[in-house]
Amino acid sequence: MFKRTLFFIAPLALVIGCSGNVQNPVDRITYRDEPLVRDVETGMTQARVLSIGGEPSRATTRTVVPGLCHDYILNRDGKQQPYYVSFDSAGRVDGQGFLTCKQLEENQRNLRR
């Protein structure tokens, strides 16, 4: 019985431990109605994202992949959740998720090693 359990848990732990962009899927469900989460799509212009989400709490230049990254703070039921929208060098969305821009940069840096 123990070996069967270990057989199923070990690969799952390996996949989770080695993934470079860990995000909580519950956050996607919790914040799915937020305009940034619901409406922003890959390829969208920076101006369009600003019209949807407003000014970010912080904007930083990306160093690992050329471009810009916007940090937002989503609020729901008294809980704050970081959310990033990243842009390529042409100013188009190339990523978004429940991390800070700093965490995104760290993940990208680690993937390039």
Which residues does each PLM region occupy?
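Bacterial N-terminal signal peptides that target proteins for export
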Residues: M1-F7
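Residues within mature, well-folded domains
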Residues: S19-R113
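C-terminal motif of bacterial Sec signal peptides marking the signal peptidase cleavage site
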Residues: L14-G17
